[in-house]
């Protein structure tokens, strides 16, 4: 742990140097706003490394995310807002405060206690147990979080069968929808129910959809290779022929 502290101090010093007049022009120009796309990108690259179970890649991407934390803290320090020490101190205090069953005299963990503590931190009256909608969080993840919050207070299906039935009901309503407004609403209800099912199956919907999309892209590229190998042009083939090549590409997945 002592070495980690030394290395972290070195990282902070490196960032200070990069932001100094003698440092890097690009780093000096960055602001909280200009760094937002990089923060999002690094987080998704870390998620990709986790999905691929690639430890070397995960190690590197965790470092890139940490860099973003140090970068923003340095910019804030220059503005006189807060320092990296403030960031760490605030985090430490929050972790201890939110785990009284570990660091205090509380007998055990409870969801209600967790929510009460969070409400006290925000200095306001208790908010709804269902949580708030964050427009910046991906829709699938937000739906999953809201459903988990509802489940914590007992508002949930007893088993997956109820969710399967709900999906069939929503699909039927989608087929019967007429105008664009109805279609959007019913499609949203169907997606919400599918995300609900993901909870019961212990499947992360974002990860599952990301993997399915990646699989589709890889198969499509394989199909393109097979078509080109046969001296044909993809755009000129009828759908029936494309389906044949698609099946061949799928077969290649299993080899």
UniProtKB/Swiss-Prot annotation:
Cofactor(s) required, per the database record: Mg(2+)
Alphabetical keyword list: ATP-binding, Hydrolase, Magnesium, Metal-binding, Nucleotide-binding
Temperature dependence as stated in the record: Optimum temperature is about 80 degrees Celsius. MazG is very stable at high temperature, and no change is detected up to 85 degrees Celsius.
Domain of life assignment: Bacteria
Binding site for ATP 1: 162-166, 169, 182-185, 189
The keyword Nucleotide-binding belongs to this UniProt entry's keyword annotation: yes
Residues given in the record as Mg(2+) binding sites: 169, 186, 189
Effect after changing residue 97 to A: Reduces the NTPase activity to 10% of the wild-type activity
Enzyme Commission numbers on file: 3.6.1.1, 3.6.1.9
Documented effect of changing residue 61 to Q: Reduces the NTPase activity to 10% of the wild-type activity
CDD domains: NTP-PPase_MazG_Cterm (cd11529), NTP-PPase_MazG_Nterm (cd11528)
BP GO terms, sorted: dATP catabolic process; dGTP catabolic process; dTTP catabolic process; dUTP catabolic process; TTP catabolic process; UTP catabolic process
Activity modulation: Inhibited by AMPCPP (alpha,beta-methyleneadenosine triphosphate).
Keyword match Ion transport: no
Residues forming coiled coils: none
Top EC class for this record: hydrolase
Result for mutant: residue 176 to A: Has little effects on the NTPase activity
Residues at which ATP 2 binds: 215-219, 246
Function: Catalyzes the hydrolysis of all eight canonical ribonucleoside triphosphates (NTP) and deoxyribonucleoside triphosphates (dNTP) to their corresponding nucleoside monophosphates ((d)NMP) and PPi and subsequently hydrolyzes the resultant PPi to Pi. The NTPase activity with deoxyribonucleoside triphosphates as substrate is higher than corresponding ribonucleoside triphosphates. dGTP is the best substrate among the deoxyribonucleoside triphosphates, and GTP is the best among the ribonucleoside triphosphates.
NCBIfam families listed in its UniProt record: mazG, PRK09562.1
Subunit comment: Homodimer.
Family the entry assigns: Belongs to the nucleoside triphosphate pyrophosphohydrolase family.
PANTHER family: NUCLEOSIDE TRIPHOSPHATE PYROPHOSPHOHYDROLASE
Protein name, as recorded: Nucleoside triphosphate pyrophosphohydrolase/pyrophosphatase MazG
